[in-house]
């Protein structure tokens, strides 16, 4: 048995359980040893006390070694004359407590044990700074930006991330920051452990490969991806103005049966992922990628549908969306928007002035489906779902009328716009909702 035991990095990186340091003594001294270690907050409750082949007992302790002063105390005061040595348990057995804990609890146990082993006092502040949730992409875990912010973590080195990864059963770690405000939607993600950020995620049978340090992936959009996948788009040409890595382009191609998609994207890293995702899903021959600013897109008079999947607002893309719609038959716009729904908010508070509201609602040359009582009907004349919030409805009506104006400006003749559906996607806060407006746009028949 060895007096000084230190867990090596090789053992941590092997993927096997980390060896645990234990104090070995005779069975009849076990209870006194346990009580002392518990009083000193050195007893490892995550692993079981083990019986050794020679009949002695090993009590697991926290940290990478146990200072000599505690060994002397155990030998001379706690249990005078007792044999007391350190050893390693190469395959420690989890205690019943550890086996029954959640991943977050297991993380707390592992990290607190490791931190105290480095001579840093564990505190409520550090515990509160641990993550409670995360995104898992295969063997990579993406942590939220609001964890591991305390200054104490910065001095603990890369072994901290090895401990976190081992506790949560992954090999790579990354930490999310705020999305870049430059319009490319590049996430400020830092790779904490591992040599690359490429991951693969499967949604509804569609494979998405991307670099988490360069591209976004929203699990919350799955309901909308499932919805558009269920649409019948056979023979249709689509324009996706904010394609990203293929969030909506791929469901339309793979499941909805779109004939062709023009995918616009200006983040070069997303374009690399998009091109790869089109290939691995077998639809590359039905999609053309347009790299660059979609406001400079040269396409026109081509689309049966346009996807405007940018939040908080896709308004900058509305003119080009009108431009690419087919002039003879029109088409459908799928417009994403974050809408505030604070009690008492009116349309003006949502960014629509009273003057604009009056101008939009009563232009002589525009036909919309707004009714005198303020309700809106779908394409079959049925009322929209009562679950639709008034703020969603007001925003949809204002968007409907504004786009009718844009269509006339772009095409030089009146168009009819009609709200088909308002789809909630997710909530970002108690009063901020991500919704999708399905808006039908058709040129008015010529008179005479």
From Swiss-Prot:
EC category name: transferase
Matches recorded under Pfam families: TRM5-TYW2_MTfase (PF02475), TYW2_N (PF25132), TYW2_N_2 (PF25133)
Result, substituting residue 225 to A: Lack of activity
One annotated GO biological process: tRNA methylation
GO cellular component: cytoplasm
Coiled-coil stretches noted in the UniProt entry, renumbered to this chain: none
Top-rank taxon, per record: Eukaryota
Function: S-adenosyl-L-methionine-dependent transferase that acts as a component of the wybutosine biosynthesis pathway. Wybutosine is a hyper modified guanosine with a tricyclic base found at the 3'-position adjacent to the anticodon of eukaryotic phenylalanine tRNA.
Protein known as: tRNA wybutosine-synthesizing protein 2 homolog
Native source species: Homo sapiens (Human)
Origin organism lineage: Eukaryota, Metazoa, Chordata, Craniata, Vertebrata
